[in-house]
Amino acid sequence: MFTLKKTLLLLFFLGTINLSLCEEERNAEEERRDGDDEMDVEVKKRFISGLIGGLMKALGK
């Protein structure tokens, strides 16, 4: 009975570590995806401001 308890405790401990590592990996992937979205928004803002600036120059001449 004692060896069974040790085995179950070991399995629980290893499962907890594995779950923790999976959560960290998932969080890292989500952060990478969030960073890409922020970059896309920044690129869109630059494009729109450049487009508006170009139109203003063209209309001003």
From Swiss-Prot:
Its main location: secreted. It is found in: Secreted. The modification Lysine amide is found at residue 61. Residues 1-22 form the signal peptide. One of its GO terms (cellular component) is extracellular region. Keywords: Amidation, Amphibian defense peptide, Antibiotic, Antimicrobial, Cleavage on pair of basic residues, Cytolysis, Fungicide, Hemolysis, Secreted, Signal. It comes from the Eukaryota. Pfam families: FSAP_sig_propep. Expressed by the skin glands. InterPro entries: Frog_antimicrobial_propeptide. Residues 23-44 form a propeptide. The keyword Signal applies. One of its GO terms (biological process) is defense response to Gram-positive bacterium. Belongs to the frog skin active peptide (FSAP) family. Temporin subfamily. Antimicrobial peptide. Active against some Gram-positive and Gram-negative bacterial strains. Active against fungus C.glabrata 090902 but not against C.albicans ATCC 12231. Shows weak hemolytic activity against human erythrocytes. This is Temporin-SN3.
